[in-house]
């Protein structure tokens, strides 16, 4: 069985733990984009959420990972404009989205 990791969520951000150690951590303010996609061709393929950070790093969160739901709950309260779960999960599973997945959040750069 593949280790899906564990997502730990706090008020300021989140971390991904795999194999008993922290492999990635970020503040909510450093999240640039969230993209949901399937790893594979079939509808039963694992669903992943690619979290792109401001520095270009992409952290992959597995839907089956403990803490994934807590991540989405906190993200919906913290990231303005995040698409509701129902708007992207069912179309992705049904195969009606593009092969590149669905962007569920994108931070708009502020212009001064």
Show which residues each predicted segment covers.
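Eukaryotic intrinsically disordered, low-complexity regulatory linkers and tails enriched in Ser/Thr/Pro
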Residues: 1-112
């Amino acid at each position: 069985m593949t280790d899906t990791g564990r997502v730990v969520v706090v008020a300021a951000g989140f971390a991904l733990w795999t194999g008993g150690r922290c492999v990635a951590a970020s503040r909510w303010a450093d999240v640039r984009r969230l993209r949901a996609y399937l790893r594979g061709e079939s509808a039963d393929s694992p669903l992943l959420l690619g979290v792109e950070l401001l520095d270009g790093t992409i952290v992959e969160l597995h839907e089956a990972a403990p803490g994934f739901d807590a991540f989405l709950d906190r993200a919906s309260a913290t990231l303005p404009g995040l698409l509701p779960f129902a708007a992207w999960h069912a179309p992705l599973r049904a195969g009606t989205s593009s092969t590149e997945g669905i962007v569920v959040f994108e931070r708009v750069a502020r212009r001064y």
